[in-house]
Swiss-Prot record:
Domain notes: The integrin I-domain (insert) is a VWFA domain. Integrins with I-domains do not undergo protease cleavage. The I-domain is necessary and sufficient for interaction with ICAM1 and F11R.
InterPro entries hit by this protein: FG-GAP (IPR013517), Int_alpha_beta-p (IPR013519), Integrin_alpha (IPR000413), Integrin_alpha_C_CS (IPR018184), Integrin_alpha_Ig-like_1 (IPR013649), Integrin_alpha_Ig-like_2 (IPR048285), Integrin_alpha_N (IPR028994), Integrin_dom_sf (IPR032695)
Residues in the signal sequence: 1-25
Gene symbol of the encoding locus: ITGAL
Matching SUPFAM superfamilies: Integrin alpha N-terminal domain, Integrin domains, vWA-like
Binding sites annotated in the UniProt record for Ca(2+) 2: 530, 532, 534, 538
Cellular localization per UniProt: Cell membrane
Extracellular side: 26-1090
Ranges facing Cytoplasmic side: 1112-1170
Record's keyword annotation contains Iron-sulfur: no
Name of the molecule in the record: Integrin alpha-L
Biased composition range(s): Basic and acidic residues: 1157-1170
CDD domains per UniProt: vWA_integrins_alpha_subunit
Phosphoserine PTM sites in chain numbering: 1165
Amino acid sequence: MKDSCITVMAMALLSGFFFFAPASSYNLDVRGARSFSPPRAGRHFGYRVLQVGNGVIVGAPGEGNSTGSLYQCQSGTGHCLPVTLRGSNYTSKYLGMTLATDPTDGSILACDPGLSRTCDQNTYLSGLCYLFRQNLQGPMLQGRPGFQECIKGNVDLVFLFDGSMSLQPDEFQKILDFMKDVMKKLSNTSYQFAAVQFSTSYKTEFDFSDYVKRKDPDALLKHVKHMLLLTNTFGAINYVATEVFREELGARPDATKVLIIITDGEATDSGNIDAAKDIIRYIIGIGKHFQTKESQETLHKFASKPASEFVKILDTFEKLKDLFTELQKKIYVIEGTSKQDLTSFNMELSSSGISADLSRGHAVVGAVGAKDWAGGFLDLKADLQDDTFIGNEPLTPEVRAGYLGYTVTWLPSRQKTSLLASGAPRYQHMGRVLLFQEPQGGGHWSQVQTIHGTQIGSYFGGELCGVDVDQDGETELLLIGAPLFYGEQRGGRVFIYQRRQLGFEEVSELQGDPGYPLGRFGEAITALTDINGDGLVDVAVGAPLEEQGAVYIFNGRHGGLSPQPSQRIEGTQVLSGIQWFGRSIHGVKDLEGDGLADVAVGAESQMIVLSSRPVVDMVTLMSFSPAEIPVHEVECSYSTSNKMKEGVNITICFQIKSLIPQFQGRLVANLTYTLQLDGHRTRRRGLFPGGRHELRRNIAVTTSMSCTDFSFHFPVCVQDLISPINVSLNFSLWEEEGTPRDQRAQGKDIPPILRPSLHSETWEIPFEKNCGEDKKCEANLRVSFSPARSRALRLTAFASLSVELSLSNLEEDAYWVQLDLHFPPGLSFRKVEMLKPHSQIPVSCEELPEESRLLSRALSCNVSSPIFKAGHSVALQMMFNTLVNSSWGDSVELHANVTCNNEDSDLLEDNSATTIIPILYPINILIQDQEDSTLYVSFTPKGPKIHQVKHMYQVRIQPSIHDHNIPTLEAVVGVPQPPSEGPITHQWSVQMEPPVPCHYEDLERLPDAAEPCLPGALFRCPVVFRQEILVQVIGTLELVGEIEASSMFSLCSSLSISFNSSKHFHLYGSNASLAQVVMKVDVVYEKQMLYLYVLSGIGGLLLLLLIFIVLYKVGFFKRNLKEKMEAGRGVPNGIPAEDSEQLASGQEAGDPGCLKPLHEKDSESGGGKD
């Protein structure tokens, strides 16, 4: 089966420079890679690699003047020797480009697609193939598939040259020199020549017979004379067709007729050239007469079609001497082809052997150059001496240059016949792959399926590989490489097609690492043997331009391949300075004889052998003592000391198991493992010695069981006594740096590698359950709401709500008790408190994410986590804040539900409870009595008998955010009781602004002296809800009798706003919505007092007279104080003279009573002087 992609040597290889970290190393040994590079093998050593027996055949195509070679490399010796081609008579320049082996008998087919030879100075390319037996020592067969014999096609060519007068002698001579040059260069070919000069007439200078007799161009044209007349081109062409191409003049009936016309001007005659329709006509126009497009088009009528191929315009005669090279190409097309198809090749450039494959002794080779590079493949006979060509059917123009046969690969089957896939990577620039059915009983090949590429220039079909995944003899997968595919910064793609009943169908694809747009992933694809021991074939894909090259390993799986590589090997990992690593790959043999598969990888001037490592599985066992952890030993207890609790002993055992049955060597694995306690928890429940949560150890493991003991203890307090303690084990292979990988140095101790599965194990140590003899705890939970602490929820800016819940466990221990509380979105959870018992029973709540804010919110509480013991009861208080802006109804409904992990479904009836709390909306009403209310009224016998009074009230209603719930309001106006007796009567009415009708209601209440302001009647008035309302209580007071005695009493009115108190409440208390006006009424009694006034006047006059007489008698009216004071003003400095003193003394004697105070003053002054 074909093992790797074939690449044309001329294809340029470009490398990109990108960085990518190495992939995991499963399971090829990179560090133990062995390199082979024989001296003088050339840079293309490693172009193809093929494992045969216990060695590797390496192809080294030639470069420059060197020839290609085959080398046989032995892994045991480390040397490569060239393969001797005994009996070969050919020089193989590109031997080693193609290698294939037959998996049934190990025979080897090596081909050189560049066997070249010259035929009439034209180069033919075909193939040269050698068939070897497995040991390369047996008889060798050689063959030349697609070999095309040099069949000389007969061509009779006539030069028809212009001899008109417009030609100068030197120009005419250059035409003759051109004809001589052509004849000399084609002298040893199957061409015959004749020459005719034309002007007004026509002259045969020499015919075909003359040329056969004497093939000397100089002698044949020695006596030519320039005619110097007109240019009758039409007549000249007809003359050649009828008079020159004649058998009696040497023309051959089987020869192709060719006419080359050389002229410097337009025709001077007219007509047609129907006689020359079977002649291939080239016309060469020379000179200044053909500078315009119109003049050039006059030549088209003389030439064959298409004119672009058969008309040539030259501006000077000097360019005639350089025209032969172009003319030779056109002549080459003619020679050896049929007259019906003058522009195609058959097998002349077949390059047969560019690809090859062998299966069940049946060999095929690709022939990309056949049929004008439409391509195809050759079915070789057993002796390689005969072949059958199979190509595109039908052979249409669009299949040309498709390169069918660039790759070929057998797709074996358990049936008698198999399929063959052949790639055409350049078909319509998209590429395609054709599937052919092998002929049965000497029949014909048949095309059964076509698979098309999808991206221009991707070289889809540039590499093919069939894969028998389960090794049952039936090819399940066809891998098609597109190494130039580009997408997502990845260069190259491999498409996976799976076999169906009617053909192959695309199922997936493989990709290389990103960052290598020119990496050519898929340049080489090969089906490896089972290298990882799972019984399925693995696949290697080369990407030679990812950095210095890379090889990807894809493991087989049932029904296909793993989409992710198990290993990516970079060339620099195996050898410094390597280039094109991964250009070819083959890995189906055990070269070392150790039972492990080896993979050969080609690079530039290198061949690398990578050994696979034995794949092992790790068997682990773990045991504990005690098997269950006693709860009473580790549970939280506040009466015990802080001493460490008893621990658990662990025994862990390891043993390796080989997954490669044929490997018989000794297995020793250096294992690194980690033990971890409760690794998924932040708070661990077990500690290794030293307070650590994990242990790391190394151990050498063999195929025998190895065991180790450990122990761990518990912290002071373990709260979670339900979930088992997890003991996790993680392990991996550990290799010391510098560990030798040379198996010859290590003997049979080849370092194994673990199977790429989850390298971890987890065990659980359960806690002992105190649930009776059946070891099964059955809880019975009950939840109920206690009488609400808040009888109603009053919606204010800072309102809160508290509810109480009672939770009980009536049966055995309950595990992971969870209390869920659903409440409306207007409430916001604040906190939870444990009311009773006052012990360390943990409770924690968290609000769950809202599923829909329009429905409800939920609270989840863990109670006594993790165990709620049997017979326990708790009382919880849940406190909520209110979100005033929320939408509220008439009540708040809270629903509680309690669950646990071990309650029977038949006991869930009392696990739910619901409470409903009414909602009261706030009303902000303020009532004030006005200053202009009548507060005092007085009645007198002579005063007005009727008084009009007013009691004024102002009602302010503040807007609320709950205006959607506006209550029905009513103003209740109380007026005084009607008098039962007395002279004063009163009547009352109510007016409101805005006006509303009021209903009068008599309370029929008797007057009560102790409660004088109790209303005797009520006015009930509906209130229009607005911010300000004015209420006037108007009264008429009338004096209807005589005032017999004075009195004073009070008349009171009142105003209050009433509403439905079951839905609303006063925001600032009921007093704010109540006002009262108290008015004092004064009744004054007046008696008849005229005679009393007369007698009082007379008595007053008599008293005044008596006072006057008394004053007169005492001399009050005779005093001369005025004169004395005026006399005193005449004394200087205010000091009386001596005469004055005497006068004063006399006066004092006459008026002792009036002057005594003055004398006392003087005596005091005098005394002061003494």
